[in-house]
Regions:
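Flexible juxtamembrane loops connecting transmembrane helices in multi-pass membrane enzymes
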Residues: 177-186, 276-321, 327, 356-360
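Membrane-interfacial loop-to-transmembrane-helix junctions in polytopic alpha-helical membrane proteins
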Residues: 10-16, 56, 60, 86, ...
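Juxtamembrane membrane-water interface segments that cap and precede transmembrane helices
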Residues: 48-55, 111, 174-186, 355-370
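N-terminal hydrophobic segments of proteins, predominantly signal-anchor/transmembrane helices
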Residues: 27-124
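Membrane-interface micro-motifs in multi-pass membrane enzymes
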Residues: 11-15, 57-67, 120-126, 185-199, ...
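Alpha-helical transmembrane segments of multi-pass inner-membrane proteins
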Residues: 1-2, 6-7, 22-28, 72, ...
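Long extracytoplasmic/lumenal interhelical loops at the membrane interface
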Residues: 305-320, 328, 332-376
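Short, aromatic-rich membrane-interface segments at the entry and exit
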Residues: 10-20, 34-39, 59-64, 217-218, ...
Length: 393
């Protein structure tokens, strides 16, 4: 392999350098799946969508999605040859909910408004499910240190992306406008970037305080926490900030010893009170005219502005479209991955904003619940809620 790499460098053919790397990855996929998965995890934050850069018509994130697709084919071949996963994993409620949701997602391809798009979304879901649920679960079960390695393999490249983003952002004075795109090409926009940072921050904090850690390990994890925190703040992603506040509140409730059933009961009561006072709440929200801003205090205040803030109003527009789409196709939905192609006719003039579009190029329903409801019908929503319930239980 070293000779092949040297030959590629000598004849000025850089693509030849990839051959020994591909050969090594292929060997690991068959003989050392843990090393192969480690490479995939480390490359996830660094992957680039070549389609968005105009370099290819295929909208895959390179190089991870081709690697995941290869892993899907290899795993299917292994299972067909008789190799089975651990029975305890198959019997786990989360596994059953995930598989039920996956089967239903496949069935909704048949009446989809865009069958090819839905089929691609379903196959994509398959390789994520196989790699990041079944194979990771098996890795975690057989290796006591796998969880720590998993987080470290994600945290290090994420910190590289945060550094890249902050350096670019600094060149634009850390303004809110630039904060929406300086993370490209690694992330599509600031919302996905902020969401990933927010999801990694709590487990990274937990690793700092985990027992039996050396002083050096605590310092390194602590530096990672600081860098993730800086990146989250500078992402100007209000949803990430609110989510972290909610996670902190939930952690405090758990530390106080409150069990799940009383917590769910309190949530139901709170939702009931919200429904009864909805009109008064809307009146109060409409009095908030603070738009999103470079000022962090004003940016936080703008979270509840549903009268003038385009970002918040567009979110309401997307939710309204998702509900209208569900009303038209309540059982089957419009098909996986089709929301962005179908929602435009469901927009109303009262909810359209300056950033609304009919071009099917600006994202999804902005809801992990309403999106499946519109695309996969009522059973799609129940699959998401079932996964949430099984995970919490």
């Amino acid at each position: 392999m070293l000779l092949l790499a040297a030959a590629g460098w000598w004849v000025d053919a850089p693509y030849v350098l990839a051959v020994p790397v591909a050969a090594l990855l292929a060997y690991w996929a068959f003989a050392r799946l843990d090393l192969y998965m480690g490479v995939v995890l480390a490359l996830v934050p660094l992957s680039i969508n070549l389609g968005e850069l105009g370099l290819t018509s295929v909208g895959w994130y390179m190089p991870t999605e081709p690697m995941l697709f290869a892993l899907l084919l290899l795993s299917c071949a292994r299972w067909l040859s008789g190799k089975r996963l651990d029975r305890t994993l198959w019997k786990h409620p989360v596994t059953w909910v995930i598989l039920a949701g996956f089967v239903w997602m496949g069935l909704t391809i048949l009446p989809s408004s865009h069958p090819v798009v839905s089929l691609k979304a379903w196959i994509s879901r398959a390789w994520f499910m196989v790699a990041f649920y079944f194979l990771l679960a098996a890795w975690f079960e057989h290796s006591p240190k796998a969880q720590t390695r998993f987080l470290a393999l994600l945290l290090v490249p994420i910190c590289v992306v945060v550094t890249y983003t902050i350096v670019r952002h600094a060149g634009h004075g850390f303004g809110k406008g630039a904060g929406h795109w300086v993370m490209k090409p690694f992330f599509k926009d600031h919302t996905s970037y902020g969401a990933v940072l927010a999801m990694l921050l709590p487990p990274a904090i937990a690793m700092v305080w985990r027992k039996h850690k050396t002083a050096l390990a605590r310092v390194l994890w602590g530096l990672g926490v600081v860098w993730l925190s800086v990146g989250t703040v500078l992402s100007y992603t209000r949803a990430a900030w609110v989510s972290l506040a909610a996670v902190g509140a939930l952690w405090a409730v758990m530390k106080l010893g409150v069990r799940l059933k009383p917590l769910l009961a309190a949530s139901v009561v709170a939702l009931g009170g919200l429904a009864l006072s909805w009109d008064a709440l809307v009146v109060q929200l409409e009095r908030n005219n603070q738009d999103s801003s470079d000022n962090f205090t004003q940016h936080i205040e703008s979270i509840s502005n549903v009268s003038t803030d385009d970002s918040n109003l567009e979110r309401l527009n997307r939710w309204s479209c998702a509900l209208a789409m569900f009303e038209e196709r309540p059982f089957w939905g419009w098909g996986p991955g089709t929301y962005q192609f179908e929602y435009a006719p469901f927009q109303t003039s009262t909810l359209r904003t300056r950033i609304s579009t009919n071009n099917a190029d600006l994202g999804n329903a902005h809801s992990e619940y309403l999106g499946p409801l519109a695309e996969q019908g009522i059973l799609g929503l129940l699959a998401v809620l079932g996964l949430l319930a099984a995970t919490l239980h």
